[in-house]
Amino acid sequence: RPLLTDEEFGSAQASTLSSHYTPETVIRNMWSALEYLGFKGGKILEPAMGVGNIIGFMPEKISRRSRISGYELDSIPGRIAKQLYPDANIKIAGYETEFHPNTKDAIVTNVPFGQIAPIDPALDKTLRNKLKGAYNLHNYFIVKGLLELKPGGVGVFITSSATMDGRNSKAREYISGLEVDLI
């Protein structure tokens, strides 16, 4: 506590319910899946960066051919990520602050979990109506990520089983209506 400002302490405290750091073996498998699918580089987004572990374990051959951007809501891990990856465009802000449809070649993330989705000025009305009862934090990150992928882009999302087998099917129905291939 003595090392943090009141604002930083509040931010760290608020993120304890939705933050989770992805193990290295999982991250390496995420990148292996992208390579298997033929991904060689491009515009990559990590919308829930933490300290940037997913970027840190990116294979060098992909990294050399990529432009990386990311978002981290919590200022402490966001500042760490900025120090570790100075060439990446990392914003210490919520993913809901901007929307860039059809612009990313790959999205690689372990989505945050929670029952309440952020208020996104660009997507809020559409998604709240279409995902009735299933508009939560992890479904928001997945759907927005899919909308930001270019045609032919690849997304690797770590999520809970509730995304695909939860009682409320609205998110699955919306995702299946998008022009994406799910693997």
Regions found by a protein language model. Give the residues of each.
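A short acidic, Gly/Pro-enriched loop at the edge of an enzyme's catalytic core
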Residues: 99-108
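Conserved acidic residues
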Residues: 42, 105, 181
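Conserved SAM/SAH-binding loop
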Residues: 92-98
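Class I S-adenosyl-L-methionine
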Residues: 1-84, 88
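Conserved Class I SAM-dependent methyltransferase catalytic core
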Residues: 75, 133-183
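Glycine-rich, phosphate-binding/catalytic loops in enzymes
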Residues: 62-63, 87-88, 123-127, 172-175
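Mobile active-site "lid"/loop adjacent to the S-adenosyl-L-methionine
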Residues: 111-141, 163
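General small-molecule cofactor/ligand-binding pocket signal
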Residues: 69, 91, 183
